[in-house]
């Protein structure tokens, strides 16, 4: 039986970019675009890129505020006030024991940013960080989508579902009137895209560091690798240490629009196990398709520390 599958075309180039800090040296970011052909039906879609940083450098944490120095106007209060209900930027630690952990920015001054839910255990420490704009639903909007019909579902930490509909080049909320294109898609989060078949072009930067993807006990977690340039083998996910042994698990789906389960996996704390609780061998070819996700159930809140696609 021939099944129509998610098709992905990728273009990658290396560009020298300057993060928004005069004291930060020029670095080479890997930027590019993916052309994603999503079939009719539903797919778990993961944007494979992040956005270029506005700041890269060191920051010292005091309470919930990170001390940074950015050019005037780079990040001002309007960045937050014009986006009700959703943050526009986040600060992420890029090295050390907390590499990959990110926190939404809720306010800022010219010399600091205040973030939400920063753990008190790291107060007073200095970190290497980046500040990036969030990827949003507008970044996956496509003119090939059907207005008021094609939609995405996002699963919230409490297990509830938020639905957004495509309209007029952007997205609207469940009331079919409130603008919602600024709805955030967090790194590693999958959205459930239901459509009649669309082509989506995403652009951005390949992430070169780890990503701490939140896992919630109260929800089915739709998550997936940030890998815009190729499928990711299940044994490359490095997810086993994040799962409770023999109880937490995840399901892999087809990408033909039917979301039929084709693989179930568990953990022994070290290795990923198949549905029969046998460790996957190093030769296992089970893979997560580029720009797609899987459904994970966790018995307790935690994080999956996802490796950079460049480390595979």
Q: Where are the regions that the model predicts?
A:
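Hydrophobic residues embedded in beta-strands of well-ordered beta-sheets
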Residues: 66-68, 111-113, 161, 170-172, ...
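Catalytic cores of histone-lysine modification enzymes
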Residues: 24-58, 65, 128-159, 197-257
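Autoprocessing Asn-cyclization modules and mimics
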Residues: 26-133
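Sec-dependent, cleavable N-terminal signal peptides
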Residues: 1-24
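Short, surface-exposed loop motifs enriched in S/T, G, D/E and P with embedded aromatic residues
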Residues: 56-63, 103-108, 162-169, 263-269
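Charged, amphipathic alpha-helical scaffolding segments
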Residues: 163-206, 271-312
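Contiguous ligand/interfacial binding patches
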Residues: 161, 165, 241-285, 311
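Short, structured motif recognition centered on aromatic/hydrophobic residues
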Residues: 87, 91, 148-155, 187-192, ...
